UniProtKB/Swiss-Prot annotation:
Example of a GO biological process term: regulation of DNA-templated transcription
A Gene Ontology term for the protein's cellular component: cytosol
Family per record: Belongs to the TACO1 family.
InterPro entries attached to this UniProt entry: Integrase-like_N (IPR017856), TACO1_YebC-like_2nd/3rd_dom (IPR048300), TACO1_YebC_N (IPR049083), Transcrip_reg_TACO1-like (IPR002876), Transcrip_reg_TACO1-like_dom3 (IPR026564), YebC-like (IPR029072)
Compartments, record wording: Cytoplasm
Keyword Transcription (UniProt): yes
Protein name: Probable transcriptional regulatory protein GAU_0635
Pfam annotation, one family: Transcrip_reg
Naturally occurring in which organism (per UniProt): Gemmatimonas aurantiaca (strain DSM 14586 / JCM 11422 / NBRC 100505 / T-27)
Amino acid sequence: MAGHSKWKTIKRAKAATDNKRGALFTRLIREITMAAKLGGGDAGGNPRLRTAIDNAKAVSMPKDNIDRAIKKGTGELEGVDYVEVLYEAYGPGGVAIMIAAVTDNPTRTVADVRHKLSRNHGNMGTINSVAFMFDRKGQMSVAAEGVAEEALMEAALEAGADDVVNDGESFVISTDPGALHATKEGLEGRKYKVENAELAWVPKNTVKVEGENATQLLKLLEALEELDDVQKVDANFEMDDDTMADA
């Protein structure tokens, strides 16, 4: 039975091999800019910025792009004034959805999100209508191939992780939000290749979806992620592997 973390892995693999690479760069640049705006441009003292830079480097973003994004965040270069917004929603099958965006126009963004929801069997929720179903966590992954689960789990816990879950293709490692970067560095110091370090809304419990609800849900999640302003979508579902693979 596959869950939302596996769906994210599938979407990342597709993004790396098709024309969505430009959209991925845009999201990473906005995250770097936002991190620098909120925590300053010194990556040494700004864990969120360090993580954003690492993620950008992992997909071969040019250094000039990274430097410009930082300077726009700190105000050294003129740029768009972004703000972070968070939306809560329901999808097919009663699935709870958290939608994080970075935007220069919240009015436009909320209208875009509402439109995608209404066109894909979803509904916008009110504040805290679904957020209480999630925990705010740091997450990262390590490819499962060639990795001993027990050794990784021991290394992850020593580095500050709360939990390690094997989703079949990778190990998903969870931490407290403030321990994300330290845990990542601890694992890298043990020669593990850590990918996709990020803050996420992790569901406390999951809802099983199947049949038409599953198909509609995957279509909705993809439609939301295609919005320019949307940075991340988290949801509390699980579904069978065959349906997930056809996503």
